[in-house]
């Protein structure tokens, strides 16, 4: 049998090879292999061989990080060597404004800018309108009838919240943020003893196992399918282990990346409140126009597949140390972005 080229992925050549094999078989003497019936059978056999060969070739390619093409596979291979691809980055800007409290009754002693949306881009920017948010409440005192919010950092994107309840009876439980476009630098995680409790503990992100013990309130991130992220908590050795029925709150910002770079004019869209005698009041008047300190910049797309394939092995080889020129070439971009 002349069928020796197992790497052949050309449909026509596969069909031709099958035809030659059958012609040399004495059981098929005097058959017309160009006839419609046999030709159709050969087409099916060649197509099946082609698909099988293609799948085998792709499976072999996707096993190695330098030849893989699907993002999920590249990310998975990078995860095996401890590399977390850079997420999408939200464009950041700074704004300032003040509130004239002379006509506000009852008179506040402090005013709080609530977390969530704070401003929108004024007009259309590149045929788009952008929302800018903050991750945490900001409280300022009222002095001489004014409350000044100066040089507040705002981030393009919507503030979203995902809640999870930890179950000790489910060893395979996963905490996956359902939205794409998450900026991993703009994530706040807090854990309550249960859903009814108001007492919460803030957890911080950790990228390594150094200086971590069983009581460290830390979490880890890894990218999973469809550019989403999974939150991983400690196991009682490297980081604090969650207790049954712990209620997890994850606040995060999803952004449009580089599309929002360059916005310099903003309109207030936030929520201002103050508390007097245990009652909360909303501030709707006396709010000045927003002044821009720094135009929005720093927005970036999620790390590309080619970049992951380039930097993941090099980050692993450097082992978080900077000794050689290649180490510096690898670590500096990772720290900057």
Protein language model features and the residues they cover:
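Signature of Asx- and small-polar-rich beta-strand/turn repeats characteristic
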Residues: 1-337
């Amino acid at each position: 049998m002349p069928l020796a080229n197992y790497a052949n992925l050309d449909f026509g050549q596969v069909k031709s090879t099958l035809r030659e094999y059958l012609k040399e078989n004495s059981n098929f003497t005097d058959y017309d292999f160009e006839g419609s019936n046999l030709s159709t059978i050969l087409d099916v056999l060649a197509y099946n061989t082609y698909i099988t060969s293609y799948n085998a070739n792709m499976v072999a390619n996707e096993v190695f990080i330098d030849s893989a093409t699907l993002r999920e596979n590249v990310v998975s291979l990078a995860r095996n060597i401890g590399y977390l691809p850079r997420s999408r980055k939200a464009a950041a800007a700074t704004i300032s404004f003040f509130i004239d409290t002379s006509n506000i009754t009852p008179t506040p002693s402090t005013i709080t800018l609530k977390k969530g949306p704070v401003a929108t881009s004024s007009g259309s920017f590149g045929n788009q309108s952008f929302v800018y948010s903050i991750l945490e409440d900001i409280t300022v005192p009222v002095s001489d009838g004014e409350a000044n919010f100066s040089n507040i950092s705002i981030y393009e994107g919507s503030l979203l919240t995902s809640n999870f309840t930890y179950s000790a009876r489910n060893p395979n439980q996963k905490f996956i943020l359902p939205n794409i476009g998450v900026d991993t630098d703009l994530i706040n995680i807090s854990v309550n003893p249960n859903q009814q409790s108001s007492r919460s503990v803030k957890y911080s992100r950790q990228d390594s196992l150094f200086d971590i013990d069983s009581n460290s309130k830390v979490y880890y991130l890894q990218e999973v399918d469809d550019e989403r992220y999974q939150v991983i908590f400690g196991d009682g050795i490297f980081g604090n282990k969650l207790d049954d029925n712990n209620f997890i709150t994850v606040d995060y910002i999803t952004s449009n990346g580089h599309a929002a770079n360059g916005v310099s004019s903003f309109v207030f869209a936030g929520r201002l409140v103050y508390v007097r005698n245990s009652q909360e009041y909303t501030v709707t008047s006396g709010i000045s126009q927003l002044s821009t300190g720094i135009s929005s910049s720093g927005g970036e797309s999620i790390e590309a597949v080619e970049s992951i394939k380039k930097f993941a092995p090099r980050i692993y080889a450097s082992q978080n140390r900077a000794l050689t020129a290649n180490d510096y070439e690898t670590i500096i971009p990772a720290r900057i972005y």
